[in-house]
Structure formats: C-alpha cells, structure tokens
Amino acid sequence: MGFFDFMTEDIAIDLGTANTLIIHNDKVVIDSPSIVARDRVSGKIIAVGKEANMMQGKTHENIKTIRPLKDGVIADFDASEKMISMLIKSIPALNKRLFTPALRMVVCIPSGITEVEMRAVKESCERVNGKEVYLIHEPMAAAIGIGIDIMQPKGNMIVDIGGGTTEIAVIALGGIVCDKSVKIAGDVFTNDIVYYMRTQHNLFVGESTAEKIKIQVGAAIEDLETPPEDMSVQGRDLLTGKPKQVAVSYREIAKALDKSIQRIEDAVMETLSQTPPELAADIYNTGIYLAGGGSMLRGLDKRISQKTDLPVYIAEDPLRAVVRGTGMALKNLVKFKSVLIK
C-alpha cells in the first residue's frame, strides 16, 4: 500500500449514449442522463445529467441541450469531458477530499469502436485526472455483470441493447469470438415513436414524451399476456397548432417499432450464422442473454426467442448490467487482465 495508492480512488464508468453510470466503492453512485446544457453566449456548461435532462426541449435560444455521445461514441469532445468531470466531482465520497485524488478507471466502450474514438474516450478520462485508464468492451462487461464466467471454454451469447447501439457478441475463453454492433437501439425506438405519432395521430411530441411512451406502453409484440393500460399523450396538433391529447395503446407502439426490432433480430441471426459450430452447440444449451435498457421492452425476449428458437433470458436489473460488470473488472484487475485494454 504505497502513498500513491492512498491517494488513488477507483471508479468504473459506463459512458452510455442515454445514461452515464459510475461505480465507486462497489456502489452505483451516479446514474444520470448523458446530457449537458450549455449557455450559447458564454459557452459555459450550466447543467449536467438530470438537471439538464429536465431542460430538454424546453430551452430558449441562449441555452442549448447537447447529448455528447452519439451511437455509443463521443460526438462532442468538449461537452463529454465537462460532463464526465462534473459527474465525477458530484460523487459524494470524493467531494469531501481536500484535493482531487488521482483516479484509476475502467470505462466501457462499444465493440465496434475505432482507434480514434477509443483514444477520445481515453483522453477524456485522462483530462479529468485519470492516471490509470482501462477500457473494456461493452458486451464483455455485460457478460461479467450478468454473472457469466467468461473465462470458461464455453460459448455465451450476449445482446446488449443500449441507447445508441445494440451490441451482440459471442464470448468464450475471455474473448469475443464474433460480434456485431448495430446503430439501432433505444434512441432509434424513441425516434420511431415520434415519427409514428406524427404520421398516425398528426401529433407532434418531443423526445422526452416519446421516451415516456416507450417506457409506459412500449412493446415488441402485439399480443402481450399482461398488456399495459393505454396511455394518454399530450402534444401539439399538426393541423390546428393547438395542444391536444390522444390515447395510445401498446399495440400501436409495437407496430411503430417493428422495423427497428426486425433489424436487431437480423443482426442476432447474422451473428449466430458466424458462430463456430462448437460454440453454437453451447449457445443452443445456454440460450441468449439480454442486457441494457432496450431489453426491458415488453415481449422482446419472446420475440427474439421465436425468431432464433433459443431460450432468451433478461439480465436482472438490465440497465445496470454493464456498469456492474465494469465494476467487477475494476475490482479484479488481475483476473480480468486479458479483457481489459490498457
């Protein structure tokens, strides 16, 4: 235990397109939307996370809300760095310190990420005082978080449906054997709902409202055993310009999301078709694991199961599976050395 260790804090970050989660001392200390609000005149960041999220779609011309990450990678370097820095500073246990501690971090990244994008993540972390920064691929982190022993010579298939990307991977012996990353996930579902409301109901709804619709009545199939109640949605009537309200059922949302879900199914099928036969035999027995917020879409597990003829399981607390895995990798750096990218 050197002096450096005493001054170092360990944190695990799931830098997501929709939400950023941070683990410190084995607890999720930050779980907030990946969004910042910037003052256009001074260029200052005035709010981040939940506070900025409440401003979304309600700002005047001097304030702009930005989502620094797009499709799982950093789109706005400056905003993402400020966001990470402000979120880390708001961790209660680190606030009390007299000076800023050096950080040892494990950050998860999408599997389809390029070298340049990877460097952007690393640099962002180094600028907020990250002395040791390790990266881990999202499907790998999800597998560890679900509780799969990834070091075994046994194939497991993970489908992680996040905000920006859906990561599909077959994992064995602590490595990714075949993977596919498609840019269809929670955000696309939200946009599908906005488009559906416009075209079918002549109702203009904002992103936040569409997000609520997705959570309350979102579905992947049109015949659920326990259907949610219809939801009343308020927005602007495109014909009259007046605010109006319509009722939306889960069947409509299932229709709205059908095409996007089909593309996720196709990606799953494609990954299965690239899987070596021995691992395919394992997957036939173990099934497919779903993680990420998108996996909470009602009936999605059933739909993928019907398409693949395989059992499909949803991780417990799927929203936090990835950050849990990232935190476990941080705790056992030696054990998971082979899956971490230095």
Model segments located where?
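Nucleotide/phosphate-binding catalytic cleft detector across ATP-hydrolyzing
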Residues: 1-161, 169-288, 295-342
